[in-house]
Amino acid sequence: MIDIQLLGLLNATLQAATLLFVAALGELITEKSGILNLGVEGMISVGAVAGFMTAVNTNNIFLAVIVGVLSSSAFASIHAVVTVVLKQDQTVSGLILTILGLALSSLIGKNYVGKKLDTKLESLFSIDDPSNILQVLLSQNIIFYVAILLMIVVSYTLKNTMFGRRLEAVGEDSKAADSMGLNVTKTQFIATCLGGAFAGLSGVYLTLSYVPYWTDNMTAGRGWIALALVIFGGWKPYRTALGALLFGFLEALVPRLQTYGFELNPYIVKIAPYIITILILVLLTIYKGGKTGAPKNIGTPFFRENR
């Protein structure tokens, strides 16, 4: 029999990892096209509040998920217009998107702070007290399984489909891709909006399952961790998933150390997972000799030459 505390740690790890991985996977798609989006934090927040408001007002979880995903994707389209169409600085646009997303979600969600959901994303299988690893896996809600499916689909798409090859070509050398007849603007626009949709799904998971309520700034820097996970995973879906599991484990473990007799400052408990993540990224970069595997054109706007 596995210790109940270890099963609780595993359950908390999977929940934290799911939230991070979905957002990171969306950012991976966006960056594969050569677009850097630092607005993930704001997009998660927009999806979270939109989904929560819809769930409170309609009691329809399916509709809440759809609204959250579409709202975040629409919000990401602002970044697409600014950076892909208008060719403006991607870093500045992303930072503004984060600030705007957090402020906007706080504004429209102020009347929903403290409200409770009558219904939320439930586990796919009704297992109240898991007693083994299999039951822990089966007790997760549907977005956990969707995340696994998305990982497989995205990995296959990037390697084996025309859309994946277009993303790769545009992200590595947009001018060469354009010369071959690929529509660089369209590809980058779609990739950016897809990234927003994934961030919205992460936000919906946050407010409809992970912590089923709404309050200001509840994303708590998870968008930035998602960005770091893309780098950690070398722009590979499976490696990014492993990174999400690692950070999810750290996020779940640190608060539990106190139950094992470790006396920790509460501020240290809050920031420890983020500090450890930064250290891992630094060590990984040093180990790789500074080579991260990033798309060569990332962050560089595409200007079509006259032909």
PLM segments and residue spans:
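Hydrophobic core segments of alpha-helical transmembrane domains in multi-pass membrane transport
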Residues: 23, 48-52, 102-106, 144-157, ...
